[in-house]
């Protein structure tokens, strides 16, 4: 598990949202509390976030964005092509990062081994050290609360930040409407 962050993605009825906390940890020390680990890519039509090694994640963002451009924004095709590249390349297989990517229609988790996972419910995914806490909170809020999509992500990440020592409550979100 990567002890650096928590990223949560949620695809609701009206909006797709990605959010992340701002903490960067090195061992048991907080190096930075306001890092931004999420992005809007492909002309703002796709949201992406990472957990793990920052340098590795930036390389993965760049590679994924090239695949997205090559597939003319088809997220499913882009993640499949990206996964194939990831698995074939000896250097990439050693990267210590995971990504979440989503658009208004699909959401995917890209693992550090090149696996592509679409969440079972098709709408909520989380990665990072506080990922399971954020995922649990998001599922509960999705099931029982009448709450805006962005607020659901913020509240879920806040709960994760209150529990996980590698996650803080300095939360940044991006929304696709």
Swiss-Prot record:
GO biological processes: proteolysis involved in protein catabolic process
* Catalytic activity annotation: ATP-dependent cleavage of peptide bonds with broad specificity
The protein's job, in short, is:
Protease subunit of a proteasome-like degradation complex believed to be a general protein degrading machinery.
The listed locations are: Cytoplasm
> Which Gene Ontology terms cover its molecular function?
metal ion binding; threonine-type endopeptidase activity
The known regulators of its activity are described as: Allosterically activated by HslU binding.
Task: Spell out the PROSITE patterns in the cross-references.
Answer: PROTEASOME_BETA_2
Q: What is this protein called?
A: ATP-dependent protease subunit HslV
Q: Active-site positions, per UniProt?
A: 5
Q: Which domain of life is it from?
A: Bacteria
What family, per the record?
Answer: Belongs to the peptidase T1B family. HslV subfamily.
Q: Please tell me the species this chain comes from.
A: Campylobacter concisus (strain 13826)
Q: What quaternary structure, including any partners, is listed in this protein's UniProt entry?
A: A double ring-shaped homohexamer of HslV is capped on each side by a ring-shaped HslU homohexamer. The assembly of the HslU/HslV complex is dependent on binding of ATP.
Q: Would I find Cell wall biogenesis/degradation among this entry's keywords?
A: no
| Main subcellular location | cytoplasm
């Amino acid at each position: 598990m990567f002890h650096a962050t928590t990223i949560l993605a949620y695809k609701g009825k009206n909006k797709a949202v990605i959010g992340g906390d701002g903490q960067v940890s090195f061992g048991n020390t907080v190096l930075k509390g306001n890092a931004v680990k999420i992005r809007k890519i492909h002309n703002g039509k796709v949201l992406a976030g990472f957990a793990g090694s920052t340098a590795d994640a930036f390389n993965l963002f760049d590679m994924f964005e090239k695949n997205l451009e090559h597939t003319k924004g088809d997220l499913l095709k882009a993640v499949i092509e990206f996964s194939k590249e990831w698995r074939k390349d000896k250097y990439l297989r050693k990267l210590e990062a995971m990504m979440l990517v989503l658009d208004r229609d699909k959401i995917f988790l890209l693992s550090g081994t090149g696996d592509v996972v679409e969440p079972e419910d098709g709408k909520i995914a989380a990665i990072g050290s506080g990922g399971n806490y954020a995922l649990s909170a998001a599922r509960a809020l999705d099931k029982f609360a009448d709450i805006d999509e962005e607020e659901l992500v913020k509240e879920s990440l806040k709960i994760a930040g209150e529990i996980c020592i590698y996650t803080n409550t300095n939360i940044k979100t991006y929304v696709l409407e």
